[in-house]
Amino acid sequence: MIVDVKAKSDYEILGQSQDDAVGEAFDKVGKLLGLPYPGGPHIEKLALKGNPSAYDFPRPMIHSDNLDMSLSGLKTAVLYTIQKIENLNEAIKADIAASFQKAVTDVLIAKIKKTIEETHRSDVIVAGGVAANKYIREEFKNLEGILNIKVYYPDLKYCGDNAAMIAFVGSMMSPSEEQNIRSQVRARWPLNELTQ
């Protein structure tokens, strides 16, 4: 999700996934590769041993006019690639992991470049579970000199669990004294519908 944070509790969603979230795509590809859950950290570790150019996976919506993303086609391309391989050994798994990680990162970088061009923002915060991925962090850090921006990340200890990040934001929005709050519960709640 790409969000323009104008002020505390003032958000505008500029782009989002049309299907799988980035972390969800990592988890699903991890499962296809027989890796433990969650897949993200295991793909990152395996990718270190692989060639990111071994497989030319698609970069869905990378050139679209909007800032939305779609990763289900990429995930499906990985599935079809795996199904064609008779002996899925560790070296091949590493190449698939590295190529997948690069494809996802290429899409993220392209969308952020487009965001900066459109919004003229100079600060980018990379957050969520995949913000712990060192490859993704490095690629975003490389944008600083190219786009004259500053990239920020939460400490790694806050990246592994979206619930912790959400709870932290909730604590910032809540008054210090205890309250009896009545609220509806929704599995998916658009960020721009939250109010203080």
Q: Where are the regions a protein language model picked out?
A:
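Beta-strand/loop-alpha-helix module characteristic of Rossmann-like adenine-cofactor folds
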Residues: 1-3
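Glycine-rich phosphate-binding loop plus the immediately following alpha-helix
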Residues: 5-51, 75-76, 80-86
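A short glycine/serine-rich beta->alpha loop
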Residues: 12-17, 63-66, 150-159
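A contiguous, well-structured pocket-lining segment that forms one wall/lid of small-molecule binding clefts
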Residues: 45-124, 133-147, 174-177, 192-196
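Conserved phosphate-binding/catalytic loops in two-lobed NTP-binding clefts
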Residues: 124, 141-165
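Active-site metal-binding loops of divalent metal-dependent hydrolases
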Residues: 129-130, 136, 156
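Glycine-rich phosphate-binding/hydrolytic loop that grips phosphoryl groups
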Residues: 154-195
